[in-house]
Amino acid sequence: MSTPKAPGLAVLPVSKSEGGASVRTLQPSGWPTPKGYANGMAADGRIVVTGGVIGWDSKGHLANGFLAQVRQTLVNIAVILAEGGARPEHLVRLTWYVIDMDEYLASLKELGMIYREIFGAHYPAMALVQVVRLVEKAARVEIEATAVVPR
């Protein structure tokens, strides 16, 4: 399977009631609504989990630069999810590992645009962790994803 390039990857249509869709955003009463993520998710179904995914293409070439790596990483996650029968709206958790928190924070607008281009406006629970480095020395971001496909 080859990895699609982001511009050709349309946001997959959201399935309204696939098997009694049972993914629900958890928003405690009185808490401010988060922007770009959820406080928590509740789901019932078959779990699809990725490993740590980085921004290399189907030929093993790492994208150049932080935003390009994020884009390719999210595309790669979409491909892995599809392979497991999952769609973007099935995502319940993303854990981001970055080597430069300042670079991430300076790119929030662009990151949001890239995210929505690939996954639409579905925002699962997310965590962001700064690390000293990643296994692939030139990688600037690595993301793990968990999805739950309704039964």
Whereabouts are the PLM-identified features?
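N-terminal presequence-like segments and the immediate start of the first folded domain
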Residues: 1-92, 98-151
